[in-house]
């Protein structure tokens, strides 16, 4: 799969702009990118209010931690039972368009229902027994000639509706005694040794003449000259 670069590269200022404003809907995002100054001020005001509230919440949490630390009795732990819980699912660009890299996806993440929790035995796991596919509409934002272009795209999400602790097939554990392993190694070594028999080929008959052993030089010359 070839990756193309459609549209202009996303400028760094856009990332800074998105990270510096509180965007809760597509309308907020569209007004921000189109340069509505009044709405930008309102978004900045919402951001400051959110920060002020978060600071107050941090102070209350700190006071709560100090009060809990003074107590000597700890509450009993409760098991996280197997059930559906709300989780955050990231919408990556691969789900929208795998052939292009110059675009943004909004919203970048959504909430899904997924099975989670622990069971009473390690041989069982929390798994979904009923699943539902839910299509949602997101925005694909491209920058062409320094102007944002908004396109619609559909992403299919998977929600878990029911969960159950199901048995997981465990891998069989093989136990070997020292004697058995040594015998198997010996058999393996013997099986690896191969004996090869090399046959010596003899020269065929009739190609070389046999010379008779004689002490008579005359007869020897006649034999060689024949």
UniProtKB/Swiss-Prot annotation:
* Classification via PROSITE patterns: PDGF_1 (PS00249), PDGF_2 (PS50278)
Q: Please provide, in alphabetical order, the Gene Ontology terms of the cellular component aspect for this entry.
A: extracellular space; membrane
Disordered: region residues: 201-226
**Comp. bias (Basic residues):** 201-215
Q: Which InterPro entries match?
A: Cystine-knot_cytokine, PD_growth_factor_CS, PDGF/VEGF_dom, PDGF_N
Q: Which GO terms describe its molecular function?
A: growth factor activity; platelet-derived growth factor receptor binding
**What name is this protein filed under?**
PDGF-related-transforming protein sis
């Amino acid at each position: 799969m070839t990756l193309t670069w459609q549209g202009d590269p996303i400028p760094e200022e856009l990332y800074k702009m998105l990270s510096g404003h509180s965007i809760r809907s597509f309308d907020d995002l569209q007004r921000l990118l189109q340069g509505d100054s009044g709405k930008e001020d309102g978004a900045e005001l919402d951001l400051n209010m959110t920060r002020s509230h978060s600071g107050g919440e941090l102070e209350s949490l700190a006071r709560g931690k100090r009060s809990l630390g003074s107590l000597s009795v700890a509450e009993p732990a409760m098991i996280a039972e197997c059930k559906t819980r709300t989780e955050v699912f990231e919408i990556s660009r691969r789900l929208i368009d795998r052939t292009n890299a110059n675009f943004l996806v909004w919203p970048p993440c959504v909430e899904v229902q997924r099975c989670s929790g622990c069971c009473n035995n390690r041989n069982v796991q929390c798994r979904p027994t009923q699943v539902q596919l839910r299509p949602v509409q997101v925005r694909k934002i491209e920058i062409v000639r320094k102007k944002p272009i908004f396109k619609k795209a559909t992403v299919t999400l998977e929600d878990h509706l029911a969960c159950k602790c199901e048995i997981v097939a465990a891998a069989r554990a093989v136990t070997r005694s020292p004697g058995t392993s040594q015998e198997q190694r010996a058999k393996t070594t013997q099986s690896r040794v191969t004996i090869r028999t090399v046959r010596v080929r003899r020269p065929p008959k009739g190609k070389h003449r046999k010379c008779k052993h004689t002490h008579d030089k005359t007869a020897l010359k006649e034999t060689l000259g024949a």
